[in-house]
Amino acid sequence: MDTPHAVRARGITKYFGDVVALDAVDLDVTQGQIHGLVGPNGAGKTTLLGLLLGLAVADGGRLEILGTPVERALAAPDGVAGFVDAPGLYPSLTARQNLAALAALRGLDKGAAGAARIDDVLAEAGLTDVADDRTRGFSLGMRQRLGLAAALLTRPRLLVLDEPSNGLDPAGKRHVHRVLTRLAADGTGVVLSSHRMDDLEALCSEVTILATGRVVFSGPLNKLAAENRELDYRLRTSDPEAARRLAAATAGIRIADGTGPGLRQDPEALVVRALVPALDELVAQIVRSGVAVRELAPVVSPLEAAFLALTEHQETGR
């Protein structure tokens, strides 16, 4: 039996004046799946998340959320919760009071059951110790966690989150990752955007990459990372000049200029661009020549390299 869809979008188009924010976008998210949405600034991620939350309506295409077609009206679909940009909070209220106000707006239980639910989501977000602190003093990471707590109030079947790890320290990030993983295991569909590839690698089974409003990749994360493409590698050896000579003479190896994302100035490091077989041959030659290899590491992860290649191709047309 097929797993039901949390989101099924076909040919979604959205305009802002003459600007095409989304251009025939397809998206499939099943229940129990954490689906990553990634792209450069202005790619259309926030617009798409807003459509899922009922904050905007599409100008074209078909959108089904939790099996129900979405009408062309501004309304949050039943069973959906989350936030885009940043959670809206009342700074003069405590975390608990913010959640109580939101619960009242949503018509949730105001009695003991409602208070217990607020306690539960505060604990789930790791905010019990600051539940009675005013949110004006909250850090960005604490505000993000309170936004997550607010989204969980209604026990949504689809959770839509914009940069949920933004501002979190490593411990806070691990906590949020555990919460999202548990929710997915319990059958909740999760769509999240992130600029951090480590978030996607830690959480997502599938990912959709947007560039200039179009889908340039959608599918399993491991398929994206496994695609055979040249990567930049940082190579440090006991004899940099010998390593450079061997690299220049090895087929399939290009010596990079040592500038760009993830590259640090290191006079002893050689940055080479290659497919894995050519890199293996270079390392073998270096070792045979008696030179010690001290470090060999990709400058960026295979996933980030794939993201950069796909989005740059779409934006430049090359």
Task: Please provide the spans of the model-predicted regions.
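ABC transporter nucleotide-binding domains
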Residues: 4-7, 14-211
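C-terminal coupling/interaction segments
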Residues: 3, 274-318
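ABC transporter nucleotide-binding domain
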Residues: 177-273
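Alpha-helix N-cap/helix-start and coil->helix boundary motif
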Residues: 13, 70, 77, 96, ...
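Small/polar loops that bind or transfer phosphate-bearing groups
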Residues: 81, 85, 192, 235, ...
